[in-house]
Amino acid sequence: MLSIPWLGLFCLLLGNFIPGYLLTILWDADWMHDLAFSERLYIQLLIGVVFNSWLLLFLAELESFGLPAILLSWVLVCGSLMWIGRHHLQVPSLRQLWLSWKTVELIALLLLACILFAHPAESLLVFDDAAIYFLGGVQLAKTGSLFVRDPILASLSQEQGVQVLFTGPLGTGWSRYWGQFFIWDWIRPWVIFGLLHLQRLWCGLFTLFLGVYGGLWVAPVFGLLAVVGLYFLGRRLFTQEIGLLAAVLLTLNFVQIWLARLPLSEMLTQALFIGGFYLFTLWMQRRGMWLGIW
């Protein structure tokens, strides 16, 4: 039975929600006032995810990716936003989340998605894309850097390296391991993980707060966010019934269930794409300046 790191989970939720909440307050977002409480929560969480994606990339590029730097960044950013928007701050009340059929439908949808998605991969092929993302996230959480400083590589001359290394496909650099672990030059003894950085960043963040096994939960969480986003998008473009039907069909889709259990970038990409399309639709309807930027 796995123990849940409740403190880490609580900090992770706050760190992704509070920046989005404060940014919408700072912009005095009048276009949000008549939205349903659950829809406002989704927008604020989505903005928080976008903000943290840039923050995590910035810290990783500085090779400062770690709990102290992330927590300090959250405190500084949120503290600054609270001070700037201190005259507009309001504590959100859960009493606004009154039970209606729409709320019951959304809760039922989330429960269904949780049942289907909450079984992250238990085994990974080391040279497979899923393992590269996962191992890259664990390495990032451990070292704070996107690069691996390989002591064996540092001890080799270029002549020796040619004997023990092999070239990647299509001239993609030298490699000492199977999979997308590349060595681009001999000046810096770095092994660089292939594929996209963003998935690896979120895997590293979840690993820091939830432990090594927590890094596998990035895909299920963003799979849930994608389902909720499609629900609100369909509701805004068409009707409540169409939004619910689209979200249910996505949840029950075999490909969605499969990819929501693997630490790949598809769920993160899907959640951000649907979220961006939703915000664009909302902007077209309401013409909020800051909303258009997001």
Q: Model-predicted segments: where are they?
A:
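Transmembrane-helix motifs of polytopic, lipid-linked glycan transferases
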Residues: 18, 78-88, 205, 214-237, ...
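Short helix- or helix-capping micro-motifs
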Residues: 246-251, 278
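Short acidic/glycine- and proline-prone juxtamembrane loop motifs at membrane-interface regions
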Residues: 255-269
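Alpha-helical transmembrane segments of multi-pass integral membrane proteins
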Residues: 8, 12, 43-44, 191, ...
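Membrane-interface transmembrane helices that cradle and orient dolichyl/undecaprenyl
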Residues: 238, 276-292
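Transmembrane signal-anchor helices characteristic of membrane glycosylation enzymes that use polyprenol
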Residues: 102-127, 138, 142-145, 151, ...
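Membrane-embedded, hydrophobic transmembrane alpha-helices
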Residues: 1-100
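Interfacial juxtamembrane loops and adjacent helix segments
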Residues: 142-207
